[in-house]
Amino acid sequence: MRSIDPNTLELEEKVVTINRVAKVVKGGRRFRFAALVVVGDKNGHVGFGMGKAQEVPEAIRKAVEDAKKNLIEVPIVNTTIPHQIVGRFGAGRVFLKPASEGTGVIAGGPVRAVLELAGIGDVLSKSLGSSNPINMVRATITGLTNLKRAEEVAKLRGKSVEELLG
């Protein structure tokens, strides 16, 4: 898989969660902030990143930098995905199903952020298992990574698209 240069894309960013985390030391607790950010160009490219710092803006900046290093390309057919798929990460599972035009993005919280920034306009989704935002985002990204267009599947099997689709 080739890497995607974030400088050539006009990326939008969306903060999914900001979490206050603590390190317990002899004198008490040391607080820091962990941010989960999704970036995308609404045209088939999306990525997520995590950052941690003592201040919220700095954590977000680090997360955006990390997200730009982890961009993936998503196959989009018209305004939806090529086929249904279940993305898995940890105990989080995300079921993604193509939808007809005009349906919109039917997804909750973290999954919606990923799908909208990827540029998918019509899709149905269901979050199963863990509702932890990090697991939800990673499961969604895993699902989108495993999507393939009909042409790619036909080429892998050595058949024509007509033979494949029947």
Swiss-Prot record:
Q: Cellular component GO terms, alphabetically?
A: small ribosomal subunit
Mark the transmembrane ranges.
none
**What range(s) does the S5 DRBM domain occupy?**
11-74
Any one GO molecular-function label of the UniProt entry: rRNA binding
* Keyword Zinc annotated: no
One short Pfam family name for this protein?
Ribosomal_S5_C
Q: Which UniProt keywords apply?
A: Ribonucleoprotein, Ribosomal protein, RNA-binding, rRNA-binding
Record-level GO BP terms: translation
Task: Please provide the record's free-text comment about the domains of this protein.
Answer: The N-terminal domain interacts with the head of the 30S subunit; the C-terminal domain interacts with the body and contacts protein S4. The interaction surface between S4 and S5 is involved in control of translational fidelity.
Query: PANTHER family under this entry?
Result: MITOCHONDRIAL RIBOSOMAL PROTEIN S5
The record ties this protein, via NCBIfam families, to: rpsE_bact
Its subunit composition reads:
Part of the 30S ribosomal subunit. Contacts proteins S4 and S8.
* Family note: Belongs to the universal ribosomal protein uS5 family.
- UniProt function note: With S4 and S12 plays an important role in translational accuracy. Located at the back of the 30S subunit body where it stabilizes the conformation of the head with respect to the body.
Q: What is this protein called?
A: Small ribosomal subunit protein uS5
Q: Organism source for this protein?
A: Shouchella clausii (strain KSM-K16) (Alkalihalobacillus clausii)
